[in-house]
A protein has these predicted regions:
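Active-site anion-handling motifs in enzyme catalytic cores
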Residues: 1-297
Length: 297
């Protein structure tokens, strides 16, 4: 069997890297004969972090080219794509509506052809399908449907769902994939609250917890060993922080309020006799400098 794992992972972010590594380790443990290719928006840094070959994401490259198009026509096309491209793709998948006869960008056609090489597609988590990220998040899934390939969505958090066009695509994609495996229950609550189909939902975990610990052959570097020694001295809680934007307005809070609340949490942890270590889970590679993911243990 030949699988393709795709999604917005390992972009200089150790949390995303752990999500992918956990899935790869689990597949290797359960079905070592399976051939697995990995695709990322940032193949060079991802390959370095994972210590394995990684393919570039052609849809991401196409999006960058379209967004950087110069001149008046370039700007007009960008507006039209933003408004109609996802509807054209959905019409192609369902073979319905007037938009199904409109030509799609060559990058989509080439990507569908690439997907035909695989037996199944896995779109790995974590928080990828968020309405504030927009409808382009569904392009890989729609292309998988056009290629008529099984699509498994593993280890996801989804929602909120407060945009009509986003909800339309979420309903179709989540209802037609082979499985939508969620890593927590809050996403399921959001889906039910917004009337998003839950027929394909399964309860799962964050695949980062499936990473092989490599106890026998693990050799920590100087920095890692330093923090391991620090954590061994007393009871320890590790935290990671983030910049809230653009979610601060959605959450009805501010960066300052978030930081003040977190400082209160830290003080209570200290009062319980723990030490607190703040860790960055991001590398800064490929311009990904936001420390906004879980601590990947």
């Amino acid at each position: 069997m030949k699988l393709l794992i795709l999604g917005n992972h390992t972009c200089g972010n150790r949390g995303d890297s752990a999500i992918l590594r956990g899935l790869l380790d689990a597949i290797n443990a359960l079905h070592p004969e399976t051939e697995v290719d990995v695709m990322s928006r940032y193949p060079v840094s991802s390959s370095w972090l994972l210590n394995r070959p990684v393919m570039g994401d052609p849809l991401y490259l196409q999006m960058k080219q379209h967004n950087n198009a110069a001149g008046v026509m370039g700007r007009v096309k960008k507006v039209l794509r933003r408004r109609y491209q996802h509807q054209v793709l959905l019409s192609r998948v369902t073979d319905s509506g007037n938009l199904r006869n409109i030509a799609i960008a060559q990058g989509f056609t080439d990507f569908v052809r690439l997907l035909s090489r695989y037996d199944a597609i896995i779109q790995v988590g974590g928080s990828f399908f968020v309405d504030l990220y927009g409808v382009p998040q569904f392009e890989h899934a729609l292309c998988s449907f056009m290629a008529k390939k099984p699509l498994y969505m593993i280890g996801h958090s989804v929602g909120p769902f407060q945009d009509e066009q986003f909800n339309q695509l979420a309903n179709y994609v989540f209802g037609h994939c082979n499985a939508l495996i969620l890593r927590e229950s809050a996403s399921l609550d959001l889906m039910k609250r917004s009337a998003i189909t839950t027929d394909k939902v399964e309860t799962g975990v964050d695949t980062a917890w499936l990473v092989d610990n490599h106890h026998e052959d693990f050799e920590p570097g100087y920095a890692v060993q330093h923090w391991l020694d620090m954590a061994a001295k007393q009871k320890t809680v590790a935290i990671t922080l983030r910049e809230l934007a653009p979610f601060d307005k959605r959450l009805g809070t501010t960066q300052q309020a978030y930081e003040q609340a977190f400082s209160g949490v830290v003080n209570r942890i200290l009062d319980e006799g723990y030490q607190v270590i703040a860790l960055s889970t991001c590398t800064g590679i490929d311009s990904y400098n936001k420390d906004d993911r879980m601590v990947a243990l």
